[in-house]
Amino acid sequence: MLRTHTSRYIKCICQTIKIASFCLIFLSIFSAATAETTGSGEMKVTLLGTGSPVPSNERFSQSILIEVEKQKLLFDLGRGVTIRLAQLDIPFRDITASFITHMHSDHLVGLPDLWLTGWLPTGFASRTNPMVIYGPRGTIAMTDDLTKAFSEDIRIRLADEKLPPKGIEFEAHDIGAGLVYQKDGVKVSAFETHHGDLIKPNFGYVVEYKGKKVVISSDTTYDERIAETARNADLLIHEVAIIDPKLLKAYPRFKEIAAHHSSPEDAGRIFSIAKPKLAVFTHIIVLKEQGPLDVSTEEVVARTRKMYSGPLAVGHDLMQFEIAEDVRVLDRSETH
C-alpha cells in the first residue's frame, strides 16, 4: 500500500513538473514575443511612475522605461517599479541597464525590490547576470551596502535554492557628465541640472538612436541647460511642482520644496526654448491646503500655456509614447 501511494505521489509530482515546465516554456516564448516591442529605428517610452515621494496608488514614484530594439533601459527606480513592469508583462531579467538621476530616496527605493525579486526563480524574473546600473557618485557604494544589508537573504537562497550567484551581483558605475552608455547604436549621455546647491551631481539624461532623441530633465529648478540639450528633441520629459500659495505662507518649509523644483511656468519657458516635438510632465508634485493631492490637469496646462503653446502632455502612470518619424501618444487622454 505504501509503495502504491508513493508511486501515485511520484507520478503526481512528475505531472506537476511537466505542467510547470510547460508554463516556463510558454512564459519564455511569451516574453520573447513581447520583447519585440519596437521596429527598426523606433523608440518606445513608458512612464512607469509619475508621482512624488507622497504615497499614491495612482502615481507611483519616478521611473521611466525606454525600449529601443531589444534593449530596455530604466531611468530611476522609484516606489512600485516592479509592479508597473509586471503590468506591462516585462520580465525583470530583461532590463538591460538602469540609470539613476540623483541619490534621493524616491528615485531609488524600488532598486532593492527589482534587484532581489529579479533574481528569484520565476517566469518573470530568473536573472542570471549582474544587474547593470549607472548613477552619480555614491552608486557603487550604495550597491555594495545593499549587498551587505541583504547578505543573509542572499546566503540562504544560494544554499537553499541554488540560485545563480552572478544573478545577485551588481555591475555598478559612478558616472560623470558625458556619454555613459553605448550599445548597438543606442547612446545614453548624462548632463548636470540644478536641483539644489547641495544636491550634486544631479543628472538629466539624453537617449539617442538613429536620429531620435529623448531628454529626461531629472528633478530640477529652471535650468536653461535642459533647454539647450533638448533643442528639437522628439520627447522632452520634465518635472513640475504645483504648491498652493497659502501653504507657502503657512509652512515656510514648503518654500524649500518649491525652491528645488520647477513651476509650470518655469517648465513652459524651457519648452518654448527647446521646441520639442512633444513636451511631457512627470514627477508631478502637488501640495494643496484642501482637496486631493493629485494634479489638476486644467491648472497645470493653463499655467504652462502662459509660456508655451506647443504640443504638451500631462503624464500619468503607464502612459506610452512611440517615436518614429513622429511622436505617437498611445493614450491621448492627457494631450493638449
Where are these regions (language model features)?
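Cap/insert and terminal regions of metallo-dependent hydrolase folds
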Residues: 203-204, 211-215, 221-319
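N-terminal secretory signal peptides that target proteins for export/translocation
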Residues: 1-15
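Bacterial N-terminal signal peptides
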Residues: 16-29
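Intrinsic disorder/low-complexity segments enriched in polar/small residues
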Residues: 12, 16-19, 37
